[in-house]
């Protein structure tokens, strides 16, 4: 088997483009949701980068960022599912590069408890990206011949669930909200809902083509992504409250010491 499935991918794209949709809006409305999602997620990434520079910490877990940027490279430039999607993926990739830079700048502060990681973070990121790129290319070459364009959904949405739960774990393990913000969450959450609406629309109006997104696995990915975003908000409130209590305690002790 070849490591690339370019011919099979081209055939899958032709099949999608040449298959008449049951309703005129089945392709255009989801494209609108995709564009909205792309803009919101880009804003979220930009806010993450700004917060990383400001707080000298970061919100996006490293393994998620490595998975994200390499996925965007694979489906933005190797297996493109259409111009609009490719533009969105390329846009995310550019912002991810800025986010990587912000993370590297914050490394001495974010990883001060582990100088070894701080000193070698650039190398860790490079190795992580190489492994993730290999993973995405291997998955594409293996599954495109059998499921075609479905591979985009089947690989993108698990990463969304992973990002949410990893961000929750990050908040709890750090015990603070440095690098995180409500603006990051709102734009990310609304972007995820817009992307989910894209598939809800397709599932309802074109189940013959997009029914795979409402299989038990598809339901887990779509509902799990939205649900875990809600859990993140609750955890953020909890950690923020603890932060305020600790700050208040420190201030009280400082006043007594005077």
UniProtKB/Swiss-Prot annotation:
* Lipid bilayer topology: Multi-pass membrane protein
What else is noted? Answer: The macrophorins cluster contains a single gene insertion (encoding for the terpene cyclase macJ) compared with the yanuthone cluster that produces the linear compound yanuthone.
| Protein name (Swiss-Prot/TrEMBL) | Terpene cyclase macJ
Q: Report the source organism.
A: Penicillium terrestre
Subcellular location, in the record's words?
A: Membrane
User: Which keywords, in A-to-Z order, does the entry hold?
Assistant: Lyase, Membrane, Transmembrane, Transmembrane helix
* Higher taxonomy: Eukaryota, Fungi, Dikarya, Ascomycota, Pezizomycotina
Keyword Transmembrane assigned: yes
General function of this protein: Terpene cyclase; part of the gene cluster that mediates the biosynthesis of macrophorins, isoprenoid epoxycyclohexenones containing cyclized drimane moieties. The first step of the pathway is the synthesis of 6-methylsalicylic acid (6-MSA) by the polyketide synthase macA. 6-MSA is then converted to m-cresol by the decarboxylase macB. The cytochrome P450 monooxygenase macC then catalyzes the oxidation of m-cresol to toluquinol.
């Amino acid at each position: 088997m070849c490591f690339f499935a370019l011919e099979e991918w081209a055939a899958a794209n032709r099949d999608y483009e040449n298959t008449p949709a049951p309703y005129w809006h089945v392709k255009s409305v989801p494209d609108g949701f995709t564009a909205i999602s792309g803009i919101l997620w880009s804003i979220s990434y930009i806010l993450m980068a700004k917060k990383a520079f400001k707080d000298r910490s970061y919100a996006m877990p490293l393994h998620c960022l490595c998975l994200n940027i390499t996925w965007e490279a694979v489906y933005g430039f190797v297996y493109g599912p259409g111009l609009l999607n490719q533009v969105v993926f390329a846009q995310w990739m550019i912002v991810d590069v800025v986010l990587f830079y912000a993370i590297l700048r914050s490394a001495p502060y974010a990883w001060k408890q582990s100088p070894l990681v701080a000193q070698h973070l650039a190398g860790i990121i490079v190795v992580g990206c190489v492994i993730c790129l290999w993973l995405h290319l291997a998955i594409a070459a293996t599954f495109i011949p059998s499921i075609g364009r479905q591979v985009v959904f089947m690989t993108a949405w698990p990463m969304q669930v992973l990002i949410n739960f990893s961000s929750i774990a990050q908040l709890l393990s750090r015990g603070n909200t440095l690098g995180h913000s409500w603006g990051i969450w709102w734009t990310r959450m609304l972007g995820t809902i817009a992307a989910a609406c894209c598939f809800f629309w397709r599932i309802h109006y074109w189940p013959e083509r997009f029914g795979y997104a409402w299989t038990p696995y598809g339901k887990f990915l779509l509902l799990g992504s939205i649900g875990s975003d809600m859990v993140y908000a609750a955890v953020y409130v909890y950690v923020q409250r603890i932060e305020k209590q600790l700050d208040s305690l420190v201030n009280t002790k400082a006043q007594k010491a005077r």
